[in-house]
Amino acid sequence: MKVEIDSFSGAKIYPGRGTLFVRGDSKIFRFQNSKSASLFKQRKNPRRVAWTVLYRRHHKKGITEEVAKKRSRKTVKAQRAIVGASLELIKERRSLKPEVRKAKRDDKAKADKEKKKADKAARKAEKAKLAAAQGSKVSKQQAKGAFQKVAATSR
């Protein structure tokens, strides 16, 4: 025995009961009684008609099983060693007090500045040494000699 379901109310339709409505696009609707057929034809929303199965389902009426809450995974940051720094070194640097960290940063900046100054002085000295060894600069044009103008000849 095949039991159909009412397209509007969701009620069971036993064999020999109910009516069939075929829409223009060949979609079939089954109704258990004229009440649900009438409401369907009035274009009523079954979720808003209090006695329908859809209404009860939509408004969580009747018996419902407790659905276990969906657990979401929480991301936890894991500290790993990177190239050039071991895990111990990273942890040690992180645990430094801000004052100590600032002092270290200032010392490093000062040392870098001094190194840069020394490099610049060394480069300047090297340049001066090269200039002294080369002597006075002579341009290529001067080395070749000035352009000689050819004297015009006439007949």
UniProtKB/Swiss-Prot annotation:
GO terms for molecular function: mRNA binding; structural constituent of ribosome. It comes from the Eukaryota. GO terms for biological process: cytoplasmic translation. Residues 98-155 are annotated as: Disordered. InterPro entries: L24e/L24_sf, Ribosomal_eL24, Ribosomal_eL24-rel_N, Ribosomal_eL24_CS. One of its GO terms (cellular component) is cytosolic large ribosomal subunit. Keywords: Ribonucleoprotein, Ribosomal protein. Transmembrane segments: none annotated. Residues 98-129 have a biased composition (Basic and acidic residues). Belongs to the eukaryotic ribosomal protein eL24 family. This is Large ribosomal subunit protein eL24. It comes from Candida glabrata (strain ATCC 2001 / BCRC 20586 / JCM 3761 / NBRC 0622 / NRRL Y-65 / CBS 138) (Yeast).
